[in-house]
């Protein structure tokens, strides 16, 4: 069913093809566009289907030839009435127009000329003009070009004073509708032709200084003045008519087909603008339909681009071109994220602004399975997104080609394009500031990151700190604005496994930053290095730096400087650690001028910094560099802290672990000369000669010391505890047990200077052999064993041992590395196992019966299941945790239970950790600490 739409606001220069182009993609049948004109610039469009009409109504508010149009629903009846009304208005206006030379001397026009009845006379003369008349009128026109009554040769035998009526386009437009009835009306009397001699008196007009022979005189005073002889003389403005624009001048040309006596009908509506119902001369129409008569406006480059949002991630360039089917797409650029995947946005470039305008009408339409948004874009966005501009011949509004725009060079000198830009600090330049560069980044990596962009030679600057390592900052300068904008679009893209931040910066700002970095390097002079030299001349061993942890993630340099108020610190010496995403790690590094200032900072340990207790640890310059190079998630992972009282022992690696320094002699069976006990004494005392199976020694420590039984694969934080192969012979004893005389040294507190717990009073040799079998619990362990004295042997088979000592596999290969062997077997200054520099502590959980407290175990509960050993060490950072003692618990299925065991060097240290850190979070869960 055909639907009619009424269009208002149509400009004068628009034609039917412009309307059809406005409704491109919709079905308009042939002859379905009717332009009425009028004051509102109206037109009627007939659509073939309701759907086309509905889609057409959605385009209301659009522009045709720069004029905004409004669409209204209409009907065929209204359309026909408006067309008929327009025709009548044209006819009435044409017949009421007075002749242009009505005020000239001569016989007045006949009163019948204002009526339609005199038209047949003139129309009949159109088809059979007299050659003499045509020649005469033409010659008159040649001599009087300013007189519009002789502006056409098609007047026939009509009097000259009627030329204005016949020569106007409005009059000619009524000929097709009036010629048919005119032939039936008898011609009225016509004024005689001899009235023509009334024209010669015109040259005698006194106000005109032109000599009389010149025929180009202006009209008489009542007629408005005419400009001096143009190529096509314009008509005198006519009285205003309702809704009619100014008329075009009459053509001056030979008679067209249809007027030369051939009798062929004249089709005035053929390829003409219907707003005027056909111009006067079909050969030279009013050239409004031809774009060649209208000078094309310069095209704004921004009018060629649109931005598309919300596309499916799987959309390709062909999908975008299919979406804009029917439009001339020049190029498509799909935007991508930092990984290189489509992000659902894109930019499209068209060949003409009309295509862009039509593309904007497809906003909120379906592409594949998603409704996309189409919005205007600019050439700057296109260039910034990485699109290329090719200055080829651009298409004008109607398809004409225009030469490319003239691009002026930056410099008038011949080499201006080849040399780099001036390095004046006052010049803005095209510079970028890079942050987050890998520490091993070089110029070639930066060039590869900005590949295909024109970088100024030797303009890449990578900043280095006082330690000689890259700080992650850099600067790059580009040659032109397009490459500069393209570089800014690579913000947060990856270089290797780190994403780079690209920020704009002026050349002056870049030079200031580079100068600041160089001054920082100069301040780190050799004099300052000498200040922190220790007596041995080691630069890195002096503790002139502080590592501040457990601070808010949003901490800033100013907060740290306020926290260190009273201690002289340079602002450039404070470094807040951030991760790869630029987020704070809750840590800061401070480098002081001397060790005294660093010691002063230790007084701030556990002081409040923005609501949190800050942990301040003094570290060496080497440690600070290590922390700065590999910033941990929290604290410094793997930072080895010196443990008081646990020095490295020659021949015993890993600070107290039994090693190759343990002799193979002195075992039962080989005799114990140092104790004076025969080798058979141990067997007679109740020790099994075939060894002690692991099941024979109960684990009195229970689950609390179960970490001693886990394998090194599960602990994964310490070396396996293996006795030397020659220690136990051919596995004759399995896990070796120290001789009875050494019991106090082996199972009591074996620290240097601590006497044994034997009854004889001799250090290390006070245990009687008979008392070993049935003594009054004189070998019972300390209270830390499991809540009370234990029998260390009331007969064969009941020999007790330290908790967990015998629960491991033979050789104690899985025990933590801090569990030492008998002290008498290691080197020492004296012959006995008494005081000496060897520190072989007992297993964690051992408490001493006297003197310094021994290692203590803490049970950590309610941790996240994904927690790692490093995170636990970070949690206890600052406390003296025994290296390699952290053990995660797993259930029978191998799944984590959220619990762990941690051993500390002393009970005081463990107690402080429980008091300070209980109910503190690890991740999103608050952990519980239970003292062993």
From Swiss-Prot:
Q: Where is the composition biased (Polar residues)?
A: 392-401, 408-417
CC per GO annotation = nucleoplasm; ribonucleoprotein complex
Compartmental location: Nucleus
* Spans annotated as Disordered: 96-116, 392-424, 717-853
Q: Where is the composition biased (Low complexity)?
A: 98-116, 717-734
The yes or no answer to whether the keyword Transcription is present is: no
Which InterPro entries does the protein's record reference?
A: ESRP (IPR050666), Nucleotide-bd_a/b_plait_sf (IPR012677), RBD_domain_sf (IPR035979), RBM12_RRM1 (IPR034591), RBM12_RRM2 (IPR034594), RBM12_RRM3 (IPR034855), RBM12_RRM4 (IPR034856), RBM12_RRM5 (IPR034854)
| GO terms classed as biological process | regulation of RNA splicing
For this UniProt record, the keywords arranged alphabetically read as follows: Disease variant, Nucleus, Phosphoprotein, Repeat, RNA-binding, Schizophrenia
Q: Which SMART domains match?
A: RRM
Q: Which residues carry this modification: Phosphoserine?
A: 352, 375, 420, 422, 424, 525
Residue ranges constituting the RRM domain according to the UniProt record: 304-379, 430-507, 856-932
Enumerate composition-biased segments (Gly residues).
Answer: 783-811
Highest taxon of source = Eukaryota
What GO terms are given for molecular function? Answer: RNA binding
Q: Which disease is the protein involved in?
A: Schizophrenia 19: A complex, multifactorial psychotic disorder or group of disorders characterized by disturbances in the form and content of thought (e.g. delusions, hallucinations), in mood (e.g. inappropriate affect), in sense of self and relationship to the external world (e.g. loss of ego boundaries, withdrawal), and in behavior (e.g bizarre or apparently purposeless behavior). Although it affects emotions, it is distinguished from mood disorders in which such disturbances are primary.
* Protein name from the UniProt record: RNA-binding protein 12
Organism, as annotated: Homo sapiens (Human)
Corresponding gene? RBM12
């Amino acid at each position: 069913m055909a639907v009619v739409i009424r269009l208002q606001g149509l400009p004068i220069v628009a034609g039917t093809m412009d309307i059809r182009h406005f409704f491109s993609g919709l079905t308009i049948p042939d002859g379905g566009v009717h332009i009425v004109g009028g004051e509102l610039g109206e037109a009627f469009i007939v659509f073939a289907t309701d759907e086309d009409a509905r889609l057409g109504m959605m385009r209301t508010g659009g522009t045709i030839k720069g004029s905004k149009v409004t669409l209204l629903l209409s009907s065929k009846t209204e359309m026909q009435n408006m067309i008929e009304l327009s025709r009548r208005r044209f006819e009435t206006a044409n017949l009421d127009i007075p002749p242009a030379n009505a005020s000239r001397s001569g016989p007045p026009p006949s009163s019948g000329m204002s009526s339609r009845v005199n038209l047949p006379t003139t129309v009949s003369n159109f088809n059979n003009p007299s050659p003499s008349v045509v020649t005469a009128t033409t010659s008159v026109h040649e001599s009087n070009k300013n007189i519009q009554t002789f502006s056409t040769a098609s007047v026939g035998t009509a009097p000259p004073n009627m030329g204005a009526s016949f020569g106007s386009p409005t009059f000619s437009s009524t000929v097709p509708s009036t010629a048919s009835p005119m032939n039936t009306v008898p011609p009225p009397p016509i004024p005689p032709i001899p009235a023509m001699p009334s024209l010669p008196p015109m040259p005698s007009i006194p106000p005109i200084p032109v000599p009389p022979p010149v025929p180009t005189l202006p009209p008489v005073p009542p007629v408005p003045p005419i400009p001096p002889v143009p190529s096509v003389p314009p008509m005198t403005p006519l009285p205003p008519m309702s809704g009619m624009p100014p008329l075009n001048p009459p053509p001056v040309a030979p008679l067209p087909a249809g007027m030369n006596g051939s009798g062929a009908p004249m089709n005035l509506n053929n390829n003409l603008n219907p707003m005027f119902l056909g111009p006067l001369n079909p050969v030279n129409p009013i050239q409004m339909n031809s774009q060649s008569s209208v000078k094309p406006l310069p095209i704004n480059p921004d009018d060629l681009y649109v931005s598309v949002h919300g596309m499916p991630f799987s959309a390709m360039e062909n999908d975008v071109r299919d979406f804009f089917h029917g439009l001339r797409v020049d190029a498509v650029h799909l935007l991508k994220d930092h990984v290189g995947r489509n992000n659902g946005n894109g930019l499209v470039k068209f060949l003409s602004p009309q295509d862009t305008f039509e593309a904007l009408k497809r906003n909120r339409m379906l592409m594949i399975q998603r409704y996309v948004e189409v919005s205007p874009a600019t050439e700057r966005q296109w260039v910034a997104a990485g699109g290329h501009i090719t200055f080829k011949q651009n298409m004008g509004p109607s398809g004409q080609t225009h030469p490319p725009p003239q691009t002026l060079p930056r410099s008038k000198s011949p080499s201006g394009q080849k040399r780099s830009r001036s390095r004046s600090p006052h010049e803005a330049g095209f510079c970028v500031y890079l942050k987050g560069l890998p520490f091993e980044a070089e110029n070639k990596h930066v060039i590869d990151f900005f590949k295909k962009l024109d970088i100024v030679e030797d303009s890449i600057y990578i900043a280095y700190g006082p330690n000689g390592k890259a700080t992650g900052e850099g600067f790059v300068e580009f040659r032109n604005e397009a490459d500069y904008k393209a570089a800014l679009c690579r913000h947060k893209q990856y270089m290797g496994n780190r994403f780079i931040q690209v920020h704009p910066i002026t050349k002056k700002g870049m030079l200031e930053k580079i100068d600041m970095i160089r001054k920082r390097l100069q301040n780190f002079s050799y004099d300052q290095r000498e200040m922190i030299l220790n007596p041995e001349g080691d630069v890195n061993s002096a503790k002139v730096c502080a590592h501040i942890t457990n601070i808010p993630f949003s901490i800033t340099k100013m907060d740290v400087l306020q926290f260190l108020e009273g201690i002289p610190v340079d602002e450039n010496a404070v470094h807040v650690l951030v991760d790869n995403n630029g987020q704070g790690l809750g840590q800061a590094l401070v480098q002081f001028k001397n060790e005294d200032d660093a010691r002063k900072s230790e007084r701030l340990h556990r002081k409040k910094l923005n609501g949190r207790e800050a942990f301040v640890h003094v570290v060496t310059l080497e440690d600070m560099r290590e922390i700065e190079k590999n910033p941990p998630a929290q604290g410094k992972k793997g930072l080895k802290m010196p443990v008081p009282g646990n020095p490295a022992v020659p021949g015993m690696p890993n600070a107290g672990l039994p090693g190759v320094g343990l002799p193979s002699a002195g075992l039962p069976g080989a005799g114990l000369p140092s104790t004076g006990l025969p080798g058979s004494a141990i067997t007679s005392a109740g020790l099994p000669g075939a060894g002690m199976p692991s099941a024979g020694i109960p684990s009195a420590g229970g689950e609390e010391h179960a970490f001693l039984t886990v394998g090194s694969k599960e602990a994964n934080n310490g070396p396996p505890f293996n006795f030397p192969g020659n220690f136990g012979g051919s596995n004759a004893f399995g896990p070796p047990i120290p001789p009875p005389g050494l019991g106090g040294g082996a199972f009591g507190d074996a620290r240097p200077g601590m006497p044994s717990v034997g009854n004889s009073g001799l250090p290390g040799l006070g245990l009687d052999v008979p008392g070993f079998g049935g003594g009054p619990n004189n070998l019972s362990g300390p209270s830390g064993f499991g809540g009370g004295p234990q029998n260390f042997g009331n007969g064969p088979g009941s020999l007790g041992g330290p908790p967990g000592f015998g629960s491991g596999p033979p050789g104690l290969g899985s025990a933590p590395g801090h569990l030492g062997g008998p002290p008498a077997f290691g080197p020492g200054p004296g012959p006995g196992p008494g005081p000496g520099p060897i520190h072989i502590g007992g297993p964690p959980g051992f408490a001493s019966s006297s003197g310094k407290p021994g290692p203590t175990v803490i049970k950590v509960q309610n941790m996240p299941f994904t927690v790692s050993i490093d995170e636990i060490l970070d949690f206890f950072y600052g406390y003296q945790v025994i290296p390699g003692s952290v053990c995660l618990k797993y259930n029978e299925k191998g799944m984590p239970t959220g619990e762990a065991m941690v051993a500390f060097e002393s009970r005081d240290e463990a107690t402080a950790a429980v008091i300070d850190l209980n109910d503190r979070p690890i991740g999103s869960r608050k952990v519980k600490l239970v003292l062993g």
